[in-house]
Amino acid sequence: MYDEQHAVITPEIRSILPMKVFCIEVGEKYKDELRYKLIWDRLTNYVRQRNEDKSNDKFVSLSMDDPAITPIDKCRFYLGVIIDNKENDSQPGVMEVPGGRYAIFRHIGDYSLLHKFYRTIYEEWFPESKYRPQSTFSFEMYMNRPASTLRTELITDIYIPVIKK
């Protein structure tokens, strides 16, 4: 049972519109702190070059594979920033997050605890809910910044596409 900070696993079920995301593939670079930081630097530079209001930026991660099924070295993992849907589709590095119904879970705490939170979602919440995961990818939206937030106060919204059982 996930009990970090006595979290309650009750998602908001909501339909979202498709979103475009400028992405950079991470692969196994997350294991190397410097290379991982360089990816984040590239994303923030991309935002700066576009002269957008940094306070409204929504940074996300996209997981295309389940590490419980796919070997870690084959998992596709991306970091990105949500961009205006009116942007040109053919821009390199732009992916679309599908619209549809999502279960949105809020995790408050250190990112290192997310794997336990996911395990509880899949092992406890889904079996008891009226929903099952859909076969498209899930994503995380980071609601605050690690550079200016205590680890125990980091907020991550986890979006898992769902369909009724």
Residue ranges and their predicted role:
Residues M1-K165:
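A solvent-exposed interaction/effector surface
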